[in-house]
Structures are given as structure tokens and as C-alpha cells.
Swiss-Prot record:
The enzyme's E.C. designation: 2.4.1.16
Protein's recorded name: Chitin synthase 2
Catalytically driven reaction(s): [(1->4)-N-acetyl-beta-D-glucosaminyl](n) + UDP-N-acetyl-alpha-D-glucosamine = [(1->4)-N-acetyl-beta-D-glucosaminyl](n+1) + UDP + H(+)
Species the sequence originates in: Neurospora crassa (strain ATCC 24698 / 74-OR23-1A / CBS 708.71 / DSM 1257 / FGSC 987)
Glycosylation sites: N55, N416, N424
Domain of life from the UniProt record: Eukaryota
Length: 1097
């Protein structure tokens, strides 16, 4: 039975005088029996014709009148053909319970407004031959029965001045309603490229039939969603060659493309929706029980009944994708599919000349990542016309971040790739530089990934619903790998950006792991599976949520290009301050902003000078892939890096397990200490990246627990194994500098271990100094100050004890108020201590009112030297170095918040971290069950049978749903927090011993020093002098290292500019001889601007 699907209001029987205009976008839909080019009408069966979308009715061919009758608005009362079919040959109309609901006219958002002089859409209808040689029979009932009978849907009496918009005039819109990039209505510049030709018939299942009737689309949408991989497929444009708008309109008129697509919706009762034309057997029967009319009465007709009032009503044009079983040829025994991209995405792509732009490649990986290459898996960069060398391999790790964090990172990466392609004078990059860059997104767990993030990936063409399978021939799938070269990007506002905004193609690999196996396993997929297949030069690691600067990735890559000894590099991590710095109003965000800034000004430059950076942050770092490789025996940086993934139970001690909580620190150490090599790590100031920092107390405490424990144990590991440095190929000077750095780290480690006692002692001596009657600020002979000090001292001790209880028995998420209250009390103690320090300093400077003694402002063993000079020098170095790096604003916007929360950094975070050293689990219990929710690929030999989307319309339906979800900001229900997993007794017992020893050590130090110097003045307190001057000395050491780093960078820039200048000054001696020595200097300075320009390149 032939049928074109649903028509629009401008379909058969539409008019301009009554009824609404039709929708704007239509796709042609065909069944297997359609034959638009047939000249004769076979007899024997009735014909199902176009459907009126507005009221879901059927109109037979007999209602189509001649052109002259329509122009005169004359409606014939009755039309009949010579042949009336039998009951069995009449068309089938579905019953009420199987029909789909279509929204009313007022619900339509897109209306096509035709001009008054345009012809009706049914003036020149396509010829539709009835099957089996039958002839047409009119089902027109006449005006009387229309009025008196059941309420038949609206049908206009005239079609003057209205017609359906042709397919070629459709301009796809963004998810926010604006014109998409590249369309004539787009506001982006003047980018007007021709729209794609009308898609081929989507419902043809026979390639020969499609080719015979539509030679233009031969080799296109002729068969399944899955196509075989071969050289011929690369040269075939599955959507037809590009054409201009006039040719598109000609084809639409020639092949009757004015009819719209079939609209399928879910059943109001929640049952499975199906097409009215899905079953060919149904169209050869007559069903009229709903109307109660005789099957032989042609004057009767059935109606569709009232609109359902309850149940889910789908939007018009949206249907759930239909799945069908298909037989697929395996490639090397593995499931590899080439899937067509959605039609709408294809419609605004600037390039469609390669299969990487028109097809998404899916691979079901059933092996461990270490065996990816050995099992014969290949990526697109290894096969066919897309075989390329990879210079830069970018890894973006993801857990359950939403679509805003993902698009913020991904859009920034694509803008960086555009910068690579803009460097036309580079020997490595250029217009086709994107072919040397591959972006790999690794998501940790299929059931954990955020649904809207999947929608964002689908909108870019990288992901498609309904393709993945749980198992292939009874082998469990470990990861689902999607490959596509996308040409569009979504910014953080979920708006499409394309070539008109400078976006270049981006080769993407999306690895969706079946199980949640943590970030370390994601990096194993990146390095051992995909990295081994691509063999890149430089690998860049990013976290979802981090937004690198516009040229950050280039500066990061340039560090490896200019120095062959660089094995790893990192950039500057900035806290995301929000619009106009609004996030800095949160003290937590402001304190972290100050911490990040001072670390990037003092710590990272110092360590970069020595050549060993203790940690390259996973949020923005890069490694030379060759330097990461293991030796012939299998030992090396990567083997040690991934060792932490297999640590469970008593097979690993707590020390080793906690050390691998900061696995990136282990990787840094293994690179520098690699036997027989001279690798160094470098900090790149020009590389910046913004990341969202925790803005709530529970998130902040939980994050720092892993950081502090990992950093502490990794530092101990590097100090214990410092002798490995002598087995490397570093120069003697480098080895000496590294030992100096080890000594610096040892002192830092000791201060960290005793930080709790040092904080208490500093508070005890400075705040207790106000209790002296000679210094009392309240003029009460020290009584008021003594009372305040005793209260705060007891509160501080009790709060520290309470902190231990909280850390041992409560999660931060379950005790939010208690953790917040403790941080507030610590802030009050810090404010009072700061007040005491300032008052004592001022009192020391001013002369005493009770005596004629002059203030003691000389350097020596006094309060001025031990308190004022030491504290002022520390803060002064912070200001000086910040101004030296031309980045001082954090000193004015975030310094106060940091120093107020400093006791919480020392007490709350440190206590919670040490009390949770037992929490070293990497895996997820209960996640070793093979799931079957996706189905599987079952078969024998080289072929398997699996369920896939039936045709292109089903792919488009899933894509359209993803765009609607992103546009409407569809909320995802929050996943309830699962119960805490039981920790092993072994870890808890070791945790207890460690916490007790740490607490006893700090308590002993605090009590001993407070008793020894309890009655001494501040100027005579040796321990206080030691603490303050040690802090000042460490700050000075960091400042010297930072200054050295800045000087080295300056010299390097000058040397690089001078070398470039020499390369561009051919014939310098001839110039000297011609102008003389006096003029050479002036000419040399005149070329300075040119040299600086070359250096910037």
C-alpha cells in the first residue's frame, strides 16, 4: 500500500480562507509500494493517501480535483471512479486506542506564512498508483454528511494563496530558536553557503528501487543505518551532492517533496507508539467497528474521537526511535559500525567530502585497555583515507559533570585548535593543523554520566542513542568508543558555533566506560589503549570543568618543542571568579583564589628552576608520550603510575595506598628519576586555565582530604627514594639542585606534620601577650584580656578535640553545620590573634605613656625584630612577588579571607585528612555484574544480529530529542546518596595508630613549649622567634626561586629574539661596512620591533 505519511495543513484540501497554515519543515516519507513515476493506476485495491496533520485525518485521491476547479473555489459534490473495491481491498484506518495524539493548531510554534498569490499545494499532486492494478475510489461524503455526521476534522474549502514551503527553503534553527550557522538567515557574518539538497527517501529498503526512481540518491539512503567499511564508502556522499536552492526546489517539485514527514507520538496510555503504515497486512483490510458503519458503505466514514485529556502528549514531529534487528558483519571478530549522522546536523556542515564528517564510528571494545592494540582494534587515524600522524593528543576526563561544565571545557579546546590552525607560518601547524590533533573524552561509568552531557555530545554528532551493546558474542563490553570529526561546537550557553565563528574540524574520540573504575583507569584507557594506537608526540590532560585560555594549549605544546629534555609541563590554574568577580564574595572561593595565585607565583616557578615539580595538576598538564614509556622489562613511569589501580586489601600497606591517592605526584617523580634519562619538568607561565573550585564546606573538605594525604605520602616516598637521582643521566649541577630541593621539601614536610601544634602555640603566645598589664588594651590591668584569652584558649582546645570526633565518625556531607560552625569559631580565634599582633606592634612603636622610655626599634632580640620584622617580611614578599609578576589583585581581594580561614586549613582539613587515611578504595563494589539493558550482538562466525535504529528517521528522532532537552533545560532527578561502603579492618587499625601518634606528637610539643615559655615575654620567647623567622626564611627562599624563574624566562625571550633576528639579518657584515660602526647600532635598534614580532610567533 502506498502512502506519503502525514501532510501538513497545506497538504491536500488546504486553503487560505479557513484553517491554519502548515508547518515549516517537512521531510518526504515513502513506503515500499510508492511509485511516483508510474503513469497508470492499477486496479484491485484501495489506496492510502496523505494525512492531514492538523486533525490526523485521511483524504483519498478522489478528493483531489482539477486545477481549474480549485482556482474557482468550486468544490464538487461527489467524485467517483469507475471501480469500487471490495471490502477486503479497502483501506485500513486504525482504531481509537492505537491512534496517536497530535497537538492542536494553537500548539504549533513554527508557522509558514505564504504569499497571497502562491498556488495551493495540491494543484499539482504527484501520481500515486494504487497497488495491484487497482483504481481510485473517492471517499468524499459530501457537505450534508459532513455536517450531520460525526465531527470530521477541519478541511478547507479553498486553497487559494497557500502552499507548503519547499524543502529547500527550510533553515534549521538552533536549540534557542535562532538560525543555525551557515544558513541564509544566520546572523554570523555573511556566511551564506548553499543548503544541502533534499535528503533521499528515508523509507526505501531496496537499493535497486531507490536507484531506479531516484538516480540522484543512488548509493545514499538506500539501505540500513549501518554501512560497510571500504574505500568506496569514503568517496560516496550519502546525502547526495551539494546543490543550490533553485535545484533543490526543482527536485522537490519533481518528486513530490511537498508532503511532510510521518509524525509519530507516544500512545496517550503509555503503550508503544507505532506508525500507521508500519504493517503492510493491515492496509489491505477494512476496519470500521469504531464507527459502527457497514464495511460496504462508502458514504460512511470513521472519526478519530475526542482528544485525550490525560497522558503524555509528545511534541509534533517527535517520535520514539524504532528499533529493528539487523545482521552486521564483524570486523576481526569485533563489532564496528559506521552510523550516519542526523540529517539536521548534516544540513549545516561546511564539509561533507569525507566519511569522517558524515558517519559516526562505533566500536564495542571487549578487552582490557592494555590489550587494545594487540587485539587488533584500530582508530580512524590508523585506517583508510583518515590515516594520519598525531602530534597532539588531548584527554578530557569526565565523571558526572553536567552539560555546562563539559561544554565550557570542550568549546575552549576547540578554540585552541583553531589557534593552532591560524599559525600559517609554523612548520608544524597551519590550515590543516586540526588533522594532527585528536581529542579523547573518557567518561567514568555509563550509568553515572550526566544525561544532558550525553545530549551535548549527541548534538555535536559524537554520540548516538541506541547503538551501544552490552556484549558481543557473550563477551562483555568494557568500553563503548565513538569516533567522529565534528565541525560544530556548543559554548557554555549551549549555543551552536561553527565555521563562521572560526571553529575548525575536530577529531574526537568518546570513550564511555561500562563500569565506574575511577580516574586512574580512565587514564589507562587514554595512555595504554588509544595512546598506543596513535603514538602521539605530546599528551595533554584536562578535567571537565577546566577552561584553558585561547592560546594555552599552544604554549604548553611549545615547551616540548623548544626543549627536548622536557618530559612534563603544566600551566597556571586559576579559580573561576565568575562574572565581575562575584564568586569572590564567598570566602571559600576567595581563599582558594589566593592559595592558587601564590602557588603559581612562588611554588611552581621555584620547582621549575630545579627541574622537578612535585605535582603536575591533572586539570591542566602535558607529558611527552615517549618519556612515559616503560623499559624492556616493563618497568617505568606508566607501570608505577597505574600500579595504584590494583591495590586492594592487605596486598598493599596504607602508606602505599595513600601515596597513590596523588598518583600524578608519583608520575612526576618517576619521570625525573627515570634510569638513564635526564627528563625535567617545566612550568609554563603563558598557559592558563580556569577551573571551578568548591564553594561549599563539604565539597571543600572532601577534596582536600585526598590532596593532603596524597601529597604527604608522596613527599615521603620521594624523600625516601632520593638516591634514584644518582642513577639518572642528569648533570652534576642538576643533581645538586635537586638535593637542595629535597631539603626544602623535608622542612616543609616537618612543618606540615607539626602544623597543629604550631598554630596553637602561636595563638597561645600572641593572644596571651595582651594579658600583660603593661600591654592591656582594655586598661584593666590585664584582667579583661586574661578572661578573653582563657575563654578562647579553652574553646580552641575543645574545638580541636571535637574535630577529631567529627572526622572519625561523620562525613562532611552529613555534618555540614558542625563543620561550618567549627570554621567560624576558628575564624574568630584568628581575628583576635591578628588584633593582638597589630596592637602589640603599634604599642611597641609608640612611646609608653607611663614612662619616658623611647620605643625600641632597633634590630636585635626584641619584640620589634622577632614579631614585626618577621611577619612584615613574609607579607611584604607576597606583595613584592605579586607585583613582579604583574598580578597583584588577589592581594587586595582575597588575602584577608585566606588569612582568616588559615586555622581551618591547618586544623579542620589536616585533622580530617589524617583521620581518614583508611579511605583508599579505588574500585566500586557490586560493579562487576554484566548488564543487559543495552542488548547484545549475538551470532555465529563473522556475522552477528543486533537491534539498531530502523532508518534515518529514527536517528533524527533521537538527535531532535537531545536538542530539545538542551534547549528546555530538562532537569535530571538527583541520584540518592548510596550507603557508605564498609572499610576493611586493616586500614582502620592502621588509621588509628597513625592518628594517635600524630595527635600525641603535636599535643606533647604544645604542652612542653607552653610550659617552658609560659611566663616569658614575646621578645624572649625562643620558640616563637624560631617559628616566625622560619616562615620568613621559607618565604624568602620561594621568592628567590620565583625571581630566578622570571629572570630565566626573560633571558630566554631575549636570546630567542636575538637568534631570530640573526636569521633575518643576512648580509650584516655588508651593512656594517657600508654604514660604519656608528650606524650599525641604530639599524640594529630599528629592527627590534621586527624581532619582537618574530619572537611572538
Amino acid at each position: 500500500m502506498a502512502g506519503y505519511g502525514h501532510s501538513t495543513a497545506g497538504g491536500f484540501g488546504s486553503g487560505s480562507g479557513s484553517g491554519p497554515p502548515g508547518p515549516q519543515y517537512m521531510l518526504p516519507q515513502y513506503d515500499e509500494g510508492d511509485d511516483p513515476d508510474a503513469d497508470a493506476t492499477p486496479a484491485g485495491q484501495g489506496v492510502r493517501l496523505l494525512t492531514n496533520l492538523d486533525n490526523s485525518s485521511y483524504i483519498s485521491v478522489s478528493e483531489i480535483t482539477s486545477q481549474s476547479s480549485h482556482r474557482d473555489n468550486i468544490r464538487p459534490s461527489r467524485l467517483r471512479q469507475a471501480y469500487e473495491p471490495s471490502i477486503d481491498a479497502r483501506t485500513y484506518e486504525p482504531s481509537l486506542d492505537t491512534r496517536t495524539y497530535e497537538p492542536s493548531i494553537s500548539d504549533r510554534r513554527h508557522m509558514y506564512e505564504p504569499s497571497i498569490d502562491e498556488r495551493s499545494s495540491y494543484m499539482d499532486p504527484p501520481r500515486i498508483p494504487p497497488p495491484d492494478g487497482g483504481s481510485y475510489v473517492s471517499s468524499y461524503m459530501g457537505t450534508e454528511s459532513m455536517v450531520s455526521g460525526h465531527g470530521r476534522p477541519w478541511s478547507p474549502e479553498s486553497a487559494t494563496g497557500y502552499r507548503v514551503p519547499p524543502q529547500g527553503r527550510y533553515e534549521p534553527s538552533e536549540i534557542d530558536g535562532h538560525a543555525r550557522p551557515g544558513t541564509p538567515g544566520s546572523s554570523y557574518g555573511n556566511a551564506r553557503r548553499p543548503l544541502p539538497s533534499a535528503p533521499a527517501p528515508l523509507h526505501y529498503n531496496s537499493p535497486s528501487r531507490a536507484a531506479s526512481h531516484y538516480p540522484r540518491y543512488h548509493g545514499g539512503y538506500a539501505d540500513d543505518v549501518t554501512v560497510s567499511m571500504g574505500p568506496d564508502d569514503d568517496r560516496t556522499d550519502i546525502f547526495g551532492p551539494e546543490t543550490d536552492l533553485s535545484e533543490t526546489r526543482h527536485l522537490n517539485d519533481a518528486y513530490g517533496f511537498r508532503s511532510s514527514q510521518i509524525t509519530l507520538s507516544e500512545d496517550p496510555h503509555g503503550t508503544h507508539a507505532r506508525s500507521r503504515y508500519d504493517d503492510e497486512d493491515d492496509v489491505s483490510t477494512t476496519y470500521s467497528s469504531n464507527t459502527g458503519t457497514s464495511a460496504s458503505g462508502v458514504d460512511k466514514f470513521e472519526h478519530y474521537g475526542p482528544i485525550p485529556e490525560e497522558g503524555k502528549h509528545e511534541r509534533r514531529g517527535v517520535r520514539p526511535p524504532q528499533m529493528s534487528r539487523k545482521e552486521v558483519q564483524l570486523i576481526n571478530g569485533e563489532l564496528v559500525l559506521e552510523c550516519k549522522i542526523p540529517t539536521i546536523l548534516y544540513s549545516f556542515l561546511p564539509r561533507r567530502d569525507e566519511v569522517e564528517f558524515t558517519h559516526m564510528r562505533y566500536t564495542a571494545v571487549t578487552c582490557d585497555p592494555d590489550d587494545f592494540v594487540a587485539r587488533g582494534y584500530k582508530l580512524r587515524q590508523n585506517i583508510g583515507r583518515t590515516a594520519r600522524e598525531t602530534e597532539l593528543f588531548i584527554c578530557v576526563t569526565m565523571y558526572n559533570e553536567d552539560e555546562f561544565g563539559f561544554t565550557r571545557t570542550m568549546h575552549a579546546v576547540m578554540k585552541n585548535i583553531s589557534h593552532f590552525c591560524s599559525r600559517n607560518k609554523s612548520r608544524t601547524w597551519g590550515a590543516d593543523g586540526w588533522q594532527k590533533i585528536v581529542v579523547c573524552v573518557v567518561s567514568d561509568g555509563r550509568e553515572i554520566i550526566h544525561p544532558r552531557t550525553l545530549d551535548a555530545l549527541a548534538a555535536m554528532g559524537v554520540y548516538q542513542h541506541g547503538i551501544a551493546k552490552n556484549f558481543v558474542n557473550q563477551k562483555a563490553v568494557q568500553a563503548h568508543v565513538y569516533e567522529y570529526t565534528t565541525q560544530v561546537s556548543l559554548d557554555s550557553d549551549l549555543k551552536f558555533k561553527g565555521a563562521e565563528k572560526g571553529i575548525v574540524p575536530c577529531q574526537m574520540i568518546f570513550c564511555l566506560k561500562e563500569k565506574n573504575q575511577k580516574k586512574l583507569n580512565s587514564h589507562r584507557w587514554f595512555f595504554n589503549a588509544f595512546g598506543k594506537a596513535l603514538n602521539p608526540n605530546v599528551c595533554i590532560l584536562l578535567d571537565v570543568g577546566t577552561r584553558p585560555g585561547g592560546t594555552s594549549l599552544y604554549h604548553l605544546w611549545k615547551a616540548f618543542d623548544t626543549d627536548s629534555n622536557v618530559a612534563g609541563a603544566c600551566g597556571e590554574i586559576k579559580a573561576m571568579k565568575g562574572r565581575f568577580g562575584g564568586n569572590l564574595l564567598n570566602p571559600l572561593v576567595a581563599s582558594q583564589n589566593f592559595e592558587y595565585k601564590m602557588s603559581n607565583i612562588l611554588d611552581k616557578p621555584l620547582e621549575s628552576v630545579f627541574g622537578y615539580i612535585t605535582v603536575l595538576p591533572g586539570a591542566l598538564s602535558a607529558y611527552r608520550y615517549h618519556a612515559l614509556q616503560n623499559d624492556e622489562t616493563g618497568h617505568g613511569p606508566l607501570s608505577q603510575y597505574f600500579k595504584g589501580e590494583t591495590l586492594h586489601g592487605q596486598h598493599a600497606d596504607v602508606f602505599t595506598a595513600n601515596m597513590y591517592l596523588a598518583e600524578d605526584r608519583i608520575l612526576c617523580w618517576e619521570l625525573v628519576a627515570k634510569r638513564g634519562e635526564r627528563w625535567v619538568l617545566k612550568y609554563v607561565k603563558g598557559c592558563t586555565g580556569e577551573t571551578d573550585v568548591p564553594d561549599t564546606v563539604p565539597e571543600f573538605v572532601s577534596q582536600r582530604r585526598r590532596w593532603l594525604n596524597g601529597a604527604f605520602f608522596a613527599a615521603v616516598y620521594s624523600l625516601v627514594h632520593f638516591r634514584q637521582i644518582w642513577k639518572t643521566d642528569h648533570t652534576f649541577m642538576r643533581k645538586a639542585l635537586l638535593h637542595v630541593e629535597f631539603l626544602y621539601h623535608l622542612l616543609q614536610l616537618l612543618f606540615t606534620y607539626f602544623s597543629l601544634a604550631n598554630f596553637y602555640l602561636a595563638f597561645y603566645f600572641i593572644a596571651g601577650g595582651l594579658a600583660d598589664p603593661h600591654v592591656d588594651p582594655f586598661n584593666s590591668d590585664g584582667h579583661v584580656a586574661r578572661i578573653i584569652f582563657n575563654i578562647l584558649r579553652y574553646v580552641c582546645v575543645l574545638l580541636i578535640c571535637t574535630q577529631f570526633i567529627l572526622s572519625l565518625g561523620n562525613r562532611p556531607q552529613g555534618a555540614k553545620r558542625m563543620y561550618l560552625a567549627s570554621m567560624i569559631i576558628y575564624a574568630v580565634i584568628m581575628v583576635y590573634t591578628t588584633f593582638a599582633t597589630i596592637f602589640i606592634v603599634v604599642r611597641q612603636i609608640q612611646p609608653s605613656q607611663k614612662s619616658d622610655d623611647k620605643p625600641d626599634l632597633e634590630l636585635g632580640n626584641n619584640v620589634f625584630t622577632n614579631l614585626i620584622v618577621s611577619v612584615a617580611s613574609t607579607l611584604g614578599l607576597y606583595f613584592v612577588m605579586s607585583f613582579l609578576y604583574l598580578d597583584p589583585w588577589h592581594m587586595f581581594t582575597s588575602a584577608i579571607q585566606y588569612f582568616v580561614l588559615l586555622p581551618s586549613y591547618i586544623c579542620t582539613l589536616q585533622i580530617y585528612a589524617f583521620c581518614n587515611t583508611h579511605d583508599v578504595t579505588w574500585g566500586t563494589k557490586g560493579d562487576n555484574v554484566m548488564r543487559t539493558d543495552l542488548g547484545g550482538a549475538i551470532g555465529k562466525g563473522s556475522t552477528v544480529e543486533l537491534e539498531m535504529p530502523s532508518d534515518q528517521l529514527d536517528i533524527d528522532s533521537g538527535y531532535d530529542e537531545c536538542l530539545r532537552n538542551l534547549r528546555d533545560r530538562v532537569m535530571v532527578p538527583a541520584v540518592p546518596v548510596s550507603e557508605d561502603q564498609l572499610q576493611q579492618d586493616y586500614y582502620k587499625s592502621v588509621r588509628t595508630y597513625m592518628v594517635v601518634s600524630w595527635m600525641v606528637a603535636n599535643a606533647t610539643l604544645a604542652m612542653a613549649v607552653s610550659e617552658a615559655y609560659g611566663d616569658s615575654e614575646i621578645g624572649d620567647n625562643f620558640y616563637l622567634r624560631f617559628i616566625l623567622w622560619a616562615v620568613a626564611a621559607l618565604a624568602l627562599f620561594r621568592a628567590l626561586g620565583s625571581t630566578t624563574f622570571a629572570a630565566i624566562n626573560l633571558v630566554s625571550a631575549l636570546v630567542e629574539g636575538r637568534v631570530r633576528l640573526r636569521l633575518n639579518m643576512k648580509g650584516f657584515r655588508w651593512i656594517k661596512e657600508k654604514w660604519g660602526d656608528a650606524d650599525v647600532k641604530g639599524k640594529f635598534e630599528g629592527l627590534g620591533d621586527r624581532a619582537r614580532g618574530l619572537a611572538r610567533r
